[in-house]
Amino acid sequence: FIESYERLIEMSDAIDIVTPTIAHFECASKALRASKHVFIEKPITHTVNEGKKLVSLVTEAGVKAQVGHVERFNPAFLAAKEYLNQPLFIETHRLAEFNPRGTDVSVVHDLMIHDLDIILSVVKSPIKKINASGVAVVSDTADIANARIEFDNGCVANLTASRISLKNMRKSRFFQRDAYISVDFLKRKTEVVRLKNLVGEPGPLDITIDLGKNKGSKIIYFDQPKVEESNAIKMELEQFIEAIRSDKQTAVTIEEGYQALVVAHQIMDKINSSLNVLV
């Protein structure tokens, strides 16, 4: 029997923090001040200020820190990554049936933040503008929310998250030049539609589209990449351990977790300022 979590920290080399969000900073900061490696569930902290302090503590401690954005390890997303190339428009839907667990934070911090992290990891461009709206239906924080993010490179992302739906859905669609990639995180399925210039005459089974007079035609290719069977939670923890053993950068850095938190708070600021949520 271990009488306190401080004693547990003292006895450990690495700490996995899965407490309610409001306790993340307290637990993580104690572990970091004891020079322990830290794996911390999303969102990294309750407030942006706490997140900023945590980033500094990780640097000062010189240890490994990874954030539990588990969808990065979803096999459907892993299968889609090689096809993603400067998407121009992204649409995400993350819908869940109501569960009292997680209502200590808004649906933006509980669910949408998964898609925010995925999008930020793919787009890699500063954000130019955010518009958002949301409503609190059964809890004291937003239960359904929509956000539109415009990036400096021209990409636009439209995100919808709900925790009061009748069915579950976790799907993202990426539109880019001559390609469309659909990722179903729930069913673990990836579909890719690609266009290529038609050279010569099409084959008997080719599907083509005519682009108009003097613009030629394109062939439509349908791909369904193989999605490997894997356990995303196990994979993220294994990569965390490997980063410690090999002294490599963690798969989802504390800075990336902080950036997702910052954007989530910016979205909630927009929602709260719209007066659609009673706070």
Label for each model-derived stretch:
Residues T45-G102:
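A contiguous active-site-proximal alpha/beta segment in oxidoreductase catalytic domains
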Residues F1-F39, P43-V55:
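Beta-loop-alpha module in the N-terminal Rossmann-like domain of NAD(P)-dependent dehydrogenases
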Residues G68-P75, F98-K129, A142-D143, G257:
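Mid-domain beta-loop-alpha active-site segment that forms a flexible
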Residues A34-K36, A61-K64, C155:
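A short helix->loop->beta-strand "cap" motif at the edges of active sites that frequently abuts
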Residues E3, I40, A65-V67, E91-T92, ...:
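Hydrophobic residues in well-ordered beta-strands that form the structural core
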Residues L116-L195, V199, K226-S230, K234-K248:
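Contiguous beta-strand/loop segments that form the cofactor/metal-binding neighborhood of enzyme cores
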